[in-house]
């Protein structure tokens, strides 16, 4: 019997972001719901056709989402927060939960969106389910069942996908005190029983139930919850229990006791688990081997995967299935659109559409199809050739990596000495004021950038236009009387892509979009070779800005770990090595900035915490190399050069040691929404260096009053000595307009001056 092939999910945004543009038109009122739904139906039909035409055994349905798949599950279960409830849940209900509802939109006091957070350690996000003790669950929104009917009527053999009950509970949060959301499990399971009964009535043979939390180090009560859950929802539909992003080593003994029919494991993220899983797989179970990486853009070495899976095929026979490691929603849609890539570079990649073909081809090869076996070998040649290419593995970069020593990551003087030097050179007042780096990216800037990229604006004219925006930003900051200025980053489209475009070793794409959440898509650059800086990147802009003012101008860099986390990494070397290469390139930029007279340099690291591995036992090793990469990038700074870093997290406690180990002279953090509560971690740790807790929530259009900012600064001063405090917004101001930016910053400067006078 032929090897069963399938994927865990397919990108829903469309190859040219058709879903994004339709959603935003609908939200603006430019199209009605019928037109929006037609776009969704057309995308689903195309996605299913891609899978069937490639020869997959199953076509996956239920993976389409109008915002994110967790929110889709929330509506399926009729579990809508009370502030958004009212009548039967529909598409507008879903958008209200995800985006919030203004006072004008509902004729009421408005209703806040539910929280959003990262989907495990990916750059995808989901709307967090809210739980209270009186919650009930009832199958409500029929989208899943309608999609199955659509797919069946189109002639596809359907395998629906459903987020599992235990993961759904785990990924949410309690919104009232004194109760544990796990106590809701029996009620939730009643709804899941009804869902599976409905699937059975639709003729579904297999359902993919995603329980990604099985890859975590679960507390006992959560691990134990699976037994009850899967005993109660047992039905006539066969269940493929699906895990991804890490190994199931910690939970495997419990998994194999569950009354399910198969297990999917991620052999891309955790290849080492294969032998253990095969050895413990219960008689009669299917093993779905996730060997085609759903989280990256690289072509699979299918000949190597074939060799790896053949012994498993011999043991399991038709009980071995071949699959993507996780949903392909984390990959761009179709490589064929990238007409501007060189043939060599293009031959290294596979986007979602190509990965579907990889899965199907590998399945045929495992069945002994000689043409497929030969095709796997031919297909894998570019990846094999790449391993020895000198323009990929550059000798000059390797020499620098081999010469990294412990001293390379250390500043030439301890913080206390540096602080004294900096106080003398910089001459800043108590409670110095600054911003985080970016200023409003106006429509004019975006039009000029687009015109330059399409050849309608010459390079010299574009540079003059950017200098005009920088001069304007400097003038506005001087008028506000900020103490440390920034150039505003008018030249940057994105804080990571800008550096990727200016460092050798990266490839950017035209259509390499992946969904972040809702209608927001990102286009990560791809690390294709050893990374090096061939020429200065930011020096010209920073020195031009400094020439316009006698105040200190802050140089602005994105840190090595953030660039790594927000790009598609290479698969042939470790993430640690990529971070070191980035660190060495940024180190050179730091040296050039200070040699050009820039005395303050900010190295942003908003993603250090995001890069944490899923298993806590792996945190220490990651944090050691992540911190070391930052320190390498900063350590070329002289004692009198002040190094800043910026982070925006909601939780510092578990990484405060590592934050301190960065040894930045100043750290700025996002604290305004937490009313300075986040500073507790720094207070309890006795954080030794300077700190700028954000006093202005830039994510809100509300203008903070002078009194409000003053109150926040006073709260901060209760936890951190005032001599070590800075005053700044939470984050960059790129997404705000100038009117609200200047109004907020005027209040920020006034509050700082008032307190400065009181403390004098």
From Swiss-Prot:
Residues the entry annotates as binding L-methionine: 436-438, 489, 604
Lineage top rank: taxon: Bacteria
GO molecular function (one): 5-methyltetrahydropteroyltriglutamate-homocysteine S-methyltransferase activity
Principal EC category: transferase
Gene3D superfamilies given in the database record: 3.20.20.210
Cofactor: how bound: Binds 1 zinc ion per subunit.
Cofactor: Zn(2+)
SUPFAM superfamilies found in the cross-reference section: UROD/MetE-like
Positions contributing to L-homocysteine binding: 436-438, 489, 604
Keywords of this entry: Amino-acid biosynthesis, Metal-binding, Methionine biosynthesis, Methyltransferase, Repeat, Transferase, Zinc
EC number(s) from the headed UniProt entry: 2.1.1.14
Catalytic activity of the protein: 5-methyltetrahydropteroyltri-L-glutamate + L-homocysteine = tetrahydropteroyltri-L-glutamate + L-methionine
Residues noted as binding 5-methyltetrahydropteroyltri-L-glutamate in the record, renumbered to the chain: 17-20, 118, 520-521, 566, 610
Active site: residue positions: 699 (proton donor)
Protein's pathway: Amino-acid biosynthesis; L-methionine biosynthesis via de novo pathway; L-methionine from L-homocysteine (MetE route): step 1/1
Residues annotated for Zn(2+) binding in this entry: 646, 648, 670, 731
Tagged with keyword Iron: no
Family in the record: Belongs to the vitamin-B12 independent methionine synthase family.
Identification of the protein by name: 5-methyltetrahydropteroyltriglutamate--homocysteine methyltransferase
Source species of the chain: Vibrio parahaemolyticus serotype O3:K6 (strain RIMD 2210633)
């Amino acid at each position: 019997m032929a090897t069963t092939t399938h994927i865990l999910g397919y990108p829903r945004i469309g190859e040219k972001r058709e879903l994004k543009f339709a959603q935003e038109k609908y939200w603006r009122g430019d199209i009605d719901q019928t037109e929006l739904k037609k776009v969704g139906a057309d995308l689903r039909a195309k996605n299913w056709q891609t899978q069937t035409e490639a020869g997959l055994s199953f076509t996956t349905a239920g993976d389409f989402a109008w915002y994110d798949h967790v929110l889709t599950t929330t509506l399926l279960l009729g579990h809508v927060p009370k502030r958004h409830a009212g009548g039967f849940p529909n598409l507008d209900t879903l958008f209200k939960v995800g985006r919030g509802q203004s006072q004008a939109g509902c004729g009421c006091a408005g209703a806040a969106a539910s929280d959003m957070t990262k989907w495990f350690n990916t750059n995808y996000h989901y709307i967090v389910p809210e739980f209270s003790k009186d919650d009930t669950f009832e199958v409500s929104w029929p989208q899943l069942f309608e999609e199955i009917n659509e797919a069946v009527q189109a002639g596809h053999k359907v395998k629906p996908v459903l987020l599992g009950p235990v993961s759904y509970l785990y990924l949410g949060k309690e919104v009232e005190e004194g109760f544990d959301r796990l106590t809701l499990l029996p009620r939730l399971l009643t709804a899941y029983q009804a869902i599976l009964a409905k699937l059975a009535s639709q003729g579904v043979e297999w359902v993919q139930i995603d329980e990604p939390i099985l890859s975590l180090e679960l507390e006992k009560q959560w691990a134990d919850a699976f037994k009850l859950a899967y005993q109660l929802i047992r039905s006539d539909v066969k269940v493929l229990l699906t895990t991804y992003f890490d190994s199931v080593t910690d939970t495997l003994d419990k998994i194999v006791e569950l009354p399910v029919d198969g297990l999917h494991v991620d052999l891309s993220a955790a290849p080492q688990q294969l032998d253990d899983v095969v050895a413990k797989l219960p008689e009669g179970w299917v093993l779905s081997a996730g060997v085609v990486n759903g989280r990256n853009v690289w072509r699979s070495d299918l000949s190597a995967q074939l060799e790896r899976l053949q012994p498993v095929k011999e043991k399991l026979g038709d009980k071995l299935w071949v699959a993507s490691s996780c949903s392909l929603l984390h990959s761009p849609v179709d490589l064929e659109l990238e007409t501007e890539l060189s043939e060599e570079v293009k031959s290294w990649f596979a986007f979602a559409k190509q990965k579907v073909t990889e899965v199907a081809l590998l399945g045929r090869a495992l069945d002994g199809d000689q043409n497929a076996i030969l095709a796997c070998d031919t297909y894998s040649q570019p990846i094999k050739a790449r391993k020895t290419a000198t323009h990929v593995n550059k000798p000059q970069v390797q020499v620098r990596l081999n010469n990294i020593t412990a001293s390379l990551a250390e500043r030439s003087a301890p913080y206390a000495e540096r602080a004294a030097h900096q106080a003398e050179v910089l001459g800043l007042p108590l409670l110095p004021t600054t911003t985080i780096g970016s200023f409003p990216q106006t429509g004019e800037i975006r039009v000029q950038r687009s015109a330059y990229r399409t050849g309608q604006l010459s390079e010299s004219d574009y540079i003059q236009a950017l200098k005009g925006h920088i001069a304007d930003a400097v003038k506005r900051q001087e008028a506000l009387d900020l103490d440390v200025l920034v150039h505003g980053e008018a030249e940057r489209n994105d804080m990571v892509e800008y550096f990727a475009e200016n460092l050798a070793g990266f490839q950017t794409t035209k259509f390499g979009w992946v969904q972040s959440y809702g209608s927001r898509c990102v286009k990560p650059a791809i690390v294709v070779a050893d990374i090096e800086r061939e020429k200065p990147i930011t020096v010209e802009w920073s020195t031009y800005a400094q020439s316009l003012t006698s105040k200190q101008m802050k140089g602005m860099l994105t840190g090595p770990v953030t660039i790594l986390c927000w790009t598609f990494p290479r698969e042939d070397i470790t993430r640690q090595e990529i971070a070191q290469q980035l660190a060495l390139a940024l180190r050179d930029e730091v040296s050039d900035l200070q040699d050009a007279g820039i005395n303050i340099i900010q190295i942003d690291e908003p993603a250090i915490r995001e890069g944490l591995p899923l298993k806590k036992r792996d945190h220490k090793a990651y944090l050691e190399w992540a911190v070391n990469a930052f320190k390498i990038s900063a350590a070329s700074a002289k004692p009198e050069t002040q190094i800043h870093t910026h982070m925006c997290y909601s939780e510092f406690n578990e990484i405060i040691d590592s934050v301190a180990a960065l040894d930045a002279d100043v750290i700025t953090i996002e604290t305004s929404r937490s009313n300075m509560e986040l500073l507790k971690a720094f207070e309890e740790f006795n954080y030794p260096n300077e700190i700028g807790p954000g006093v202005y929530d830039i994510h809100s259009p509300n203008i903070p009053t002078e009194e409000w900012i003053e109150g926040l600064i006073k709260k901060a001063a209760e936890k951190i000595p005032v001599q070590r405090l800075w005053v700044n917004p939470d984050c960059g101001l790129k997404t705000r307009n100038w009117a609200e930016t200047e109004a907020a910053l005027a209040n920020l400067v006034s509050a700082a001056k008032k307190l400065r006078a009181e403390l004098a």
